[in-house]
């Protein structure tokens, strides 16, 4: 294990390689036989399950229900909404045949040319079209509204440059699709779900985010507005961590979804969609982890506490086992997930390094002297600090420590992010500062042409027009740093994943 840890590239040497090493060595995920598709390993999936469980609870608390819609979408459905199909056309995987057959030369199976589909099917890149075709059958009257549906699913988008969790051809996500009687209700829903995502990111992931609206050039294909939460990684790059879209009546018109309103008049339905994906795993890893491995927030750690015994003989181990049994029971009563690793096939030092690599928030160690003194050694993963504490009331001590760790890693990430937010007024200064990374607040004239020029010349994009103020005067009008034309307010630029 010492060698494996040594092989973990340091962030300062190659941040990208550090991330790749960590995902594999911490047993989170690995590449598969299919290019661009990943295998999420049990430990990585356990983290995703905790994310999924918490988000699902938050969705249900806001009145949403889960449903499931088909993986395969008729090609004609994508043609109904012009902007939408243009946004996804190059990424779509297409099913053209419904059957294979044995090759005549015995070399294996081949596509049966006689089994060509009358209409090709698209493996869902997102589900707006298939869902709105379904909603047409569900909605006739204002009494049928609102519909607040969420789907947990996989989606597929061909990606040329893939990275585990951050950008893969197939990924897991949730997608909410809601239908409303009024524009106001739909807009409120889009903001409500953005706030749910922000609360989840900050309270559970301990990842500080900026809430804002995307520029027209960056918004979701087919949306009137796209709201986003943007996080900053340790290399100063932005990661879009969740989006919520106000779709207006575009999809209702495309699929002729109308309802009779309270005035007994026909009207098109208003819509939203919103989603987060396994990209959140990448955000979690890159925001908190260090050169020793993962640093997981206790709220999402599959194992919050690990206990490791150090013993000289089997008799001593039995005494430690008996002592630890009660501690484990009391920790579990407090809802803390705990693992007692008394397996004899690995040395304590190996276990320490392994659990450190996997980001377990708290490690408890009991040896022979601890047994005599009724103490345990406690190590917290976020700071690597150690302390010897009494076993009396240790469950309460650990419970408080987990909350302290959760708060500390959020504070650390927030302090770092805030220190990397810069304000610039000239394009020359912008080009200099963007090389250093971080978020840059600058004036922009609101045109696609200027936005594209900045992107082409610096690889920086407008992450969002933020809702909150970061520096005095950033919400006041000014002059575009590139053209000198009027600008309504400063926007956030950054290079991104």
Swiss-Prot record:
Which residue ranges traverse the bilayer? Answer: none
Whether Cytoplasm counts among this entry's keywords is: yes
The GO terms this record gives for MF are: ATP binding; proline-tRNA ligase activity
Indicate yes or no for the key word Cytoplasm. yes
Q: List, alphabetically, the InterPro entries matched.
A: aa-tRNA-synt_IIb, aa-tRNA-synth_II, aa-tRNA-synth_II/BPL/LPL, Anticodon-bd, Anticodon-bd_dom_sf, Pro-tRNA-ligase_IIa_arc-type, Pro-tRNA_ligase_II_C, Pro-tRNA_synth_II
State a GO cellular component annotated for this protein.
aminoacyl-tRNA synthetase multienzyme complex
Catalysed conversion reaction: tRNA(Pro) + L-proline + ATP = L-prolyl-tRNA(Pro) + AMP + diphosphate
EC number from the UniProt entry: 6.1.1.15
Could you list this entry's UniProt keywords, alphabetically sorted: Aminoacyl-tRNA synthetase, ATP-binding, Cytoplasm, Ligase, Nucleotide-binding, Protein biosynthesis
Q: Coiled-coil stretches, from where to where?
A: none
Give the UniProt subcellular location, in the record's own words.
Cytoplasm
| Gene Ontology process terms (BP) | prolyl-tRNA aminoacylation
Q: Which family does it belong to?
A: Belongs to the class-II aminoacyl-tRNA synthetase family. ProS type 3 subfamily.
Notes concerning its domains: Consists of three domains: the N-terminal catalytic domain, the anticodon-binding domain and the C-terminal extension.
Function summary:
Catalyzes the attachment of proline to tRNA(Pro) in a two-step reaction: proline is first activated by ATP to form Pro-AMP and then transferred to the acceptor end of tRNA(Pro).
Protein's recorded name: Proline--tRNA ligase
- Species whose genome carries this gene: Bacteroides fragilis (strain ATCC 25285 / DSM 2151 / CCUG 4856 / JCM 11019 / LMG 10263 / NCTC 9343 / Onslow / VPI 2553 / EN-2)
Q: Which gene encodes it?
A: proS
